[in-house]
């Protein structure tokens, strides 16, 4: 088994490379002597930087090229941010490992202000996420929310250049890049419900590659997997992509799961929220039931309005 070289398909952004190196190190620590190589590549989401993500349209903006590399044999595994992973996979591929989750929260980042509540009326806040935008606008309709694209370094540069008074980024991404000092205050799930799978790293591979799947098995984190599968089951039932105003967050206490979710209109005028508590063994069923509840409360109409501009296919 150890004469095999594992090739990791990864995006070229600093954060994606951090995640790929993390998986590389975990594999080599669990299997001394195993050779693991990175295969960096560029995705559609990396190329189109002058258009809001929601307007680019489509699921899997950051993963399709990596999946092609798996299918044609250029790579053995692909490493993703779980929040970027679509609910559907090409035939023959699947999500086989979810690593231990890091901090799932969003971060308020500013050079002048310490918290969202401290921002004066009319302040400009940058984020490319419809999920963040709808929650920001609901909480602070007096703010000007503008789109913000690019990798973490690019976004911070735009803040430092004075284009924005504050920006919202993922806590986990800043920590992984050694930029934790830029966080002025984390936003609790009550303030801003995270994206599905936020803070977790997922590994995709060919489902018939039993050798690679066996090598990956020790990297799977059971608690994280249960939480993320509940969140993803809800997202699947809502037919949500990664660029839709959907938030979901599951917490596990022993065998008891608490799942929260929301669907909002991008302008923040409509927000549908719900939650479920139940046994962890029913994580995916709870996700589906919570999605049904949200759809019945008006989430279907909100999402249809969003998809009319950007189909989720």
Curated annotation (Swiss-Prot):
Q: Does the keyword Transferase apply?
A: yes
Q: Which residues, by range, are in coiled-coil regions?
A: none
Tell me the cofactors it needs. Answer: dipyrromethane
For whether the record's keyword set contains Coiled coil, the answer is: no
> Which EC class is the enzyme in?
transferase
Could you tell me which Gene3D superfamilies the record lists for this protein? Periplasmic binding protein-like II, Porphobilinogen deaminase, C-terminal domain
Could you give a GO molecular-function term held by this entry?
hydroxymethylbilane synthase activity
Q: Cellular component per GO?
A: cytoplasm
Describe the reaction catalysed, as an equation: 4 porphobilinogen + H2O = hydroxymethylbilane + 4 NH4(+)
| Entries under PROSITE patterns matching the protein | PORPHOBILINOGEN_DEAM (PS00533)
Residues annotated with S-(dipyrrolylmethanemethyl)cysteine modification: 242
| Pathway as given in its UniProt record | Porphyrin-containing compound metabolism; protoporphyrin-IX biosynthesis; coproporphyrinogen-III from 5-aminolevulinate: step 2/4
In the Enzyme Commission scheme, what number(s) does this protein have?
2.5.1.61
Cited InterPro entries: HemC, Porphobilin_deaminase_cofac_BS, Porphobilin_deaminase_N, Porphobilinogen_deaminase_C, Porphobilinogen_deaminase_C_sf
Q: List the disulfide bonds.
A: none
Q: How is the cofactor bound?
A: Binds 1 dipyrromethane group covalently.
Q: What else does the entry mention about this protein?
A: The porphobilinogen subunits are added to the dipyrromethane group.
Name the family the entry cites.
Belongs to the HMBS family.
Function, in words? Tetrapolymerization of the monopyrrole PBG into the hydroxymethylbilane pre-uroporphyrinogen in several discrete steps.
| PANTHER family documented for this protein | PORPHOBILINOGEN DEAMINASE
Q: How does it assemble?
A: Monomer.
Name of the protein in question: Porphobilinogen deaminase
Query: Which species is the source of this protein?
Result: Serratia proteamaculans (strain 568)
Q: Identify the gene encoding this protein.
A: hemC
């Amino acid at each position: 088994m150890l004469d095999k070289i594992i090739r990791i398909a990864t995006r070229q952004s600093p954060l994606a490379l951090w995640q790929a190196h993390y998986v590389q190190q975990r594999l080599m620590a669990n299997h001394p002597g195993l050779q693991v190589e990175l295969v960096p590549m560029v995705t559609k989401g990396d190329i189109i930087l002058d258009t809001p993500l929601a307007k680019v349209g489509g699921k899997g903006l950051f993963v399709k090229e990596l999946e092609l590399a798996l299918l044609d044999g250029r790579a053995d595994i692909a490493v993703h941010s779980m929040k970027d992973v679509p609910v559907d996979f090409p035939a023959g591929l699947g999500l086989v490992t979810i690593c231990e989750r890091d901090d799932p929260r969003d971060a308020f980042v500013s050079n002048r202000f310490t918290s969202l509540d401290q921002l004066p009326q009319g302040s400009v806040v940058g984020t490319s996420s419809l999920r963040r935008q709808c929650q920001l606008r609901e909480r602070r309709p007096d703010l000007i929310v503008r789109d913000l694209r690019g990798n973490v370094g690019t976004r911070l540069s735009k803040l430092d250049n004075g284009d924005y008074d504050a920006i919202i980024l993922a806590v986990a991404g800043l920590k992984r890049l050694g930029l934790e000092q830029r966080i002025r205050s984390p936003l609790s799930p009550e303030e801003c419900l995270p994206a599905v799978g936020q803070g977790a790293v997922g590994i995709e591979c060919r489902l018939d590659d039993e050798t690679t799947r066996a090598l990956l098995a020790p990297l799977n984190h059971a608690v994280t997997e249960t939480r993320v599968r509940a969140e993803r089951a809800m997202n699947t039932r809502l037919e949500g992509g990664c660029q839709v105003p959907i938030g979901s967050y599951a917490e596990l206490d022993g065998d008891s799961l608490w799942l929260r979710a929301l669907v909002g209109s991008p302008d923040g005028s409509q927000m549908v929220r719900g939650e479920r508590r139940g046994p962890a063994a029913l994580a995916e069923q709870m996700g589906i039931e919570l999605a049904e509840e949200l759809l019945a409360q008006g989430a279907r109409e909100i999402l249809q309005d969003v998809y009319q501009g950007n189909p989720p296919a």
